[in-house]
Curated annotation (Swiss-Prot):
One of its GO terms (biological process) is leucyl-tRNA aminoacylation. One of its GO terms (cellular component) is cytosol. One of its GO terms (molecular function) is leucine-tRNA ligase activity. Its EC number is 6.1.1.4. Belongs to the class-I aminoacyl-tRNA synthetase family. A motif ('HIGH' region) lies at residues 42-52. Gene3D superfamilies: 2.20.28.290, 3.10.20.590, HUPs (3.40.50.620), Isoleucyl-tRNA Synthetase, Domain 1 (1.10.730.10), Valyl/Leucyl/Isoleucyl-tRNA synthetase, editing domain (3.90.740.10). This is Leucine--tRNA ligase. The gene is leuS. The keyword Metal-binding does not apply. The lineage of its organism: Bacteria, Pseudomonadati, Pseudomonadota, Gammaproteobacteria, Vibrionales. A motif ('KMSKS' region) lies at residues 622-626. It comes from Vibrio campbellii (strain ATCC BAA-1116). HAMAP family: Leu_tRNA_synth_B. The keyword Ribonucleoprotein does not apply. It comes from the Bacteria.
Length: 862
């Protein structure tokens, strides 16, 4: 082997070996235990960033570790290639999204190879190709035929100037990002998949996911939002308002029913439209509400606004008349779009009632009998009913049941289960996505495109004007036939979450002449380890779980869930610096262009950019283009080698925590690999070592061998069960420090060092595979890619001797080395006769001797 560690040449050589030998190409093998490891596939944005590198390094470490456990490991990669950024880049660079996307894929593929990830490239695909989305289109038509797909009008962001629909991220402060025109909400027909049909199963099956972080499961439970309540009807005073006889509301707190003082309805509620017909002021308010898109999370903090409709509702039990208001905090797509308002016991209702001078009627008091005060805020806890007629004195559950029973008996309400989860809207009014395979004939009937006419291909040779989708602008593209009749194609495309909801399954049989080949899919699925960011908890991870159940019910897979174990890696942070420009805005400066001075504690005391300007340190924040604080992985690989970058990524922080990028840490990782290289080189230059003869080892040799096997046991557990990769690396580093100081003179010394170095190299292999490949060969072993993970020798862990601490009156006076099986009497005799101990006990009476087996002897004397 070469004397100096030269990662660049070495890594190229090893990567060529993997490519030439198709090392990571796998197929189904019923005689081998399978392991499917998957990192969330990348969007081909142009260049890898450090977040990608962290995600894919974790996946590669897990894959290679499992490979050395003797498993049949599949680790595929592909490209989540549709989406809005490609459209924006195409407009900016005067090209079409397709060539921009394919160029990026080629560049990023090369970057992934340079990092040494062990992917089965035979399974690679990009979701923007017809070979992929054709099966998605066909599956969608099957769902339509099963009644799981429907079309209804739904609200979108509309720019009246550009006459186009905007994605949420294209709306900035309520205006179009391109022309700054105020954005309106517009109702247009869109396609939906009935995920709500699976809401209960999606909720229940979270309990099966023992390998998922609790936090992600909690987020999904909240997103699905199952609640038990009562759907009840308030009659309208004028017995019938244009065909509406009553007003349905849903409540989870029927115990508060006697405290209702008004009813709130959403701006999109049919009654609101009726009430506004002869009321221009109300019509204007409704329009304002519709054009103010409110996220559910903002409802609690936003200003509550409303307007009376002039309609009156009648309380279903006590007959009291209550006004009906349009309120901006009532959402049309939750429950019935109407709420019974109980200001004394709901904070939003309280704020609204206070603002508009509506009655506040308390009907619940604390169980403990403490005083009830609703003058400043609502009392929202569950308690005991009062001023509620026959229900007085009942606590929550009893009141819930009694009031629900009375409403049911009178035909005015029913107990019901509600879900916060809404059906999945899959229509996007964009170009760069998979065309939705539906057509409309001249009689207005909608039909799925027949399977023999699929795929509906998205034209790639287009001109982007940045406003209208090319397939909407090209009237000829939409023209087609259905059963010989003229028809028009759907010009919306699928939400890109569609492609990412089943890609994990396509990897099992990427060339299959169907969405999946069941026998292959059922060999590999479910995914054993999935790795990705927690920001995908409620969308991608939920849609994938849903899609898996759809595939199961269509007979393609037998499992209920797609991902057995989930690891959510933390973000990568870096220093960020800025200066204020003439307009008072922040100009962000790349950290590589900043010279910093630090005090003794490492805090930044001064920072200047390359032009000598003072810049402000904004702290360690997430690497991003907007803050200009991303570090190019390519530069780091060119400078230090892929193994060093991988080692730093896995060592600098626990995998699920944020990682602070420090180049000094990268340098430290590089120094460590040089030390490993040097020690192996020194050892192998002296020739081959013999086999270990455990019986012939000295005490020191046994102790060193024990350290080696303890390290193997710890590293195995840290990588496999605990997934604390950083502590595994720390243990290897600690062992290396001992090996560097270990004697190498005798044959037995060299034997132990040989065993230890082979263990170190094998344990480093998942993390730093290139250097490990080379050092393994230098140590006389063949092909580390197919080697076995080191196993620890239980006998080597057994200690022949133990060190006992001896205290006199609680103070350390001696340390004894005794046989591991020494009795209490033997230890006491040795301790009491120890030369140093007797100095402190001479002339004293020994009152008590306390022995903690294998650890401590405490002598009490006075």
């Amino acid at each position: 082997m070469q004397e100096q560690y030269n990662p660049q040449d070495l890594e190229q050589k090893v990567q060529k070996h993997w490519d030439d030998n198709k090392t990571f190409v796998v197929s189904e093998d019923p005689n081998k235990e399978k392991f499917y490891c998957l990192s969330m596939f990348p969007y081909p944005s142009g260049r890898l960033h450090m977040g990608h590198v962290r995600n894919y390094t974790i996946g590669d470490v897990v894959s290679r570790f499992q490979r050395l456990q003797g498993k049949n490991v599949m680790q595929p990669i592909g490209w989540d290639a549709f989406g809005l950024p490609a459209e924006n880049a195409a407009v900016k660079n005067n090209t079409a999204p397709a060539p921009w996307t394919y160029e990026n894929i080629e560049y990023m593929k090369n970057q992934l190879k340079l990092l040494g990830f062990g992917y089965d490239w035979n399974r690679e695909f990009a979701t923007c190709t017809p070979e992929y989305y054709r099966w998605e289109q066909e599956f969608f038509t099957k769902l339509y035929e099963k009644g799981l797909v429907y079309k209804k009008t739904s609200s979108v962001n509309w720019c009246p100037n550009d006459q186009t629909v905007l994605a949420n991220e294209q709306v900035e402060d309520g205006c179009c990002w391109r022309c700054d025109t105020p954005v309106e909400q517009k109702e247009i027909p869109q396609w939906f998949i009935k995920i709500t049909e699976y809401a209960q199963e999606l909720l229940d099956d979270l309990d099966k996911l023992e390998g998922w972080p609790e936090m992600v499961k909690t987020m999904q439970r909240n997103w699905i939002g199952r609640s038990e309540g009562v759907e009840l009807r308030f009659a309208l005073k004028d017995s019938e308002v244009k065909g509406q006889q009553d007003l349905e509301v849903y409540t989870t707190r029927p115990d508060t029913l006697m405290g209702v003082t008004y009813v709130g309805i959403a701006a999109g509620h049919p009654l609101a439209t009726i009430a506004a017909e002869n009321n221009p002021e109300l019509a204007a308010f409704i329009e304002e509400c519709k054009n103010t898109k409110v996220a559910e999370a903002e409802l609690a903090t936003m200003e509550k606004k409303g307007m009376a409709t002039g309609l009156t509702a009648i309380h279903p039990l006590n007959g009291r008349e209550v006004p009906v208001y349009v309120a901006n905090f009532v959402l049309m797509d939750y429950g019935t779009g109407a709420v019974m308002a109980v200001p004394a016991h709901d904070q939003r209702d309280f704020e609204f009632a206070t603002k508009y001078g509506l009655d506040i009627v308390p009907v619940i008091k604390p169980v403990d009998g403490s005083e009830l005060d609703t003058s400043e805020a609502a009392y929202t806890e569950k308690g005991v009913l009062f001023d509620s007629g026959e229900f007085d004195g009942l606590e929550f559950q009893a009141a819930f049941d009694a009031i629900a029973a009375k409403l049911e008996a009178e035909g005015k309400g029913t107990k019901t289960v509600n879900f916060r989860l809404r059906d999945w809207g899959v229509s996007r009014q964009r170009y760069w996505g998979a065309p939705i395979p539906m057509v409309t004939t001249e009689d207005g009937e909608v039909h799925p495109v027949p399977a023999d006419q699929l795929p509906v291909i998205l034209p790639e040779d287009v001109v982007m004007d940045g406003v209208t989708s090319p397939i909407k602008a090209d009237k000829e593209w939409a023209k087609t036939t259905f059963n010989g009749e003229p028809a028009l194609r759907e010009t919306d495309t699928f939400d890109t979450f569609m492609e990412s909801s089943w890609y994990y399954a396509r990897y099992c049989s990427p060339q299959a002449d169907d969405i999946l080949a069941p026998e292959k899919a059922n060999y590999w699925l479910p995914v054993d380890q999935y790795i990705g960011g927690i920001e995908h908890a409620c969308m991608h991870l939920l849609y994938s779980r849903f899609f898996h159940k759809l595939l199961r019910d269509a007979g393609y897979v037998t499992s209920d869930e797609p991902f057995k174990q989930l690891l959510c890696q933390g973000m990568v942070l870096a220093d960020a610096f800025y200066f204020e420009n003439e307009k008072g805005g922040k100009e962000w400066v790349a950290p590589t262009d900043v010279a910093v001075e630090r005090d003794g504690k490492g805090r930044i005391t001064s920072a200047k950019d390359t032009e000598g300007r003072d810049v402000t340190h904004s702290g360690m924040i997430k690497m991003s283009k907007s803050k200009n604080n991303g570090i190019d992985p390519q530069e780091m690989v060119d400078k230090y080698g892929a193994d060093t970058v991988r080692l730093f990524m896995m060592f600098a922080s626990p995998a699920d925590m944020t990682l602070e990028w420090q180049e000094s840490g990268v340098e430290g990782a590089n120094r460590f690999l040089k030390r490993v290289w040097k020690l192996v080189n020194e050892h192998t230059s002296k020739g081959a070592a013999e086999a270990v003869d455990a019986a012939a080892l000295s005490g020191d040799q046994k102790a060193l061998r024990r350290d080696v096997h303890k390290t193997i046991a710890k590293v195995t557990d840290d990588i496999d069960r605990r997934q604390t990769f950083n502590t595994a690396i720390a243990a290897i580093m600690e062992l290396m420090n001992k090996l560097a100081k270990a004697p190498q003179e005798s044959a037995q010394d060299r034997v132990i060092l040989d065993e230890a170095l082979k263990a170190v190299v094998a344990m480093l292999y998942p993390i730093t595979p290139h250097i490990s490949y080379e050092l393994w060969a230098a140590l006389g072993e063949a092909d580390i890619d197919n080697a076995a993970w080191p196993t620890f020798d239980e006998k080597a862990l057994v200690e022949d001797e133990k060190t006992i601490v001896v205290q006199v009156n609680g103070k350390l006076r001696a340390k004894l080395t005794v046989a591991a099986d020494a009795t209490k009497e033997q230890v006491e005799e040795l301790g009491l006769n120890d030369e140093n101990v007797t100095k402190f006990t001479d002339g004293l009476t020994i009152r008590k001797v306390i022995y903690v087996p294998g650890k401590l002897l405490n002598i009490v004397a006075n």
